[in-house]
Amino acid sequence: MGPGLRPLLPLVLCVGLSALVPSAGASGFRKRGPSVTAKVFFDVRIGDKDVGRIVIGLFGKVVPKTVENFVALATGEKGYGYKGSKFHRVIKDFMIQGGDFTRGDGTGGISIYGETFPDENFKLKHYGIGWVSMANAGPDTNGSQFFITLTKPTWLDGKHVVFGKVLDGMTVVHSIELQATDGHDRPFTDCSIVNSGKIDVKTPFVVEVSDW
């Protein structure tokens, strides 16, 4: 399951956008984006080296069901989840993909609602680098797999549900991106989530969307 190259690998805002208002930014035109209501973390190991933590902000007001699924899989509260799984698909300047904790090759994974669940909405877009979206095998086939963008893949808008953004740890994401891969985009060196969990957000806060 995955975004984009589906023939090669089978699995890859009304309310929210109304809140987008212009604001000034030193690095270009910016708009206020969705509110972060929860955060999760992934502690990542590449080979036998711990490379750091990825912290992802989640937009529970826009896509509450998708966020609930992601948080539960990060904490492992249902008895299964992301801890111990790998980033199994890496395409430089496009995305890194993970979340297949049942098979580890992009053909597995399950949600907390059953094997799959429907697309919640497409109110959020793939605005640029560091946005987090659900991988799928077509409409309404969301499970546990997700990807983190390394570009602005607008061709995925309306096809994959965006639900989060990397808040900290893009250096870790880029370390995964730089791994050598085989002909199926699988890293030769394991890129593993050795620990994962939830970080409480006492007061929701807004992320900015740049240059779109």
From Swiss-Prot:
One Pfam family, short name: Pro_isomerase
Entry-linked InterPro entries: Cyclophilin-like_dom_sf, Cyclophilin-type_PPIase_CS, Cyclophilin-type_PPIase_dom
Protein name, per record: Peptidyl-prolyl cis-trans isomerase C
Keywords: Cytoplasm, Isomerase, Rotamase
Subcellular location: Cytoplasm
Protein family membership: Belongs to the cyclophilin-type PPIase family.
EC number(s) recorded for this UniProt protein: 5.2.1.8
Domain PPIase cyclophilin-type: 41-198
Keyword Nucleus in annotation: no
GO cellular component: cytoplasm; intracellular membrane-bounded organelle
Membrane-traversing stretches: none
UniProt GO molecular function: cyclosporin A binding; peptidyl-prolyl cis-trans isomerase activity
Function: PPIase that catalyzes the cis-trans isomerization of proline imidic peptide bonds in oligopeptides and may therefore assist protein folding.
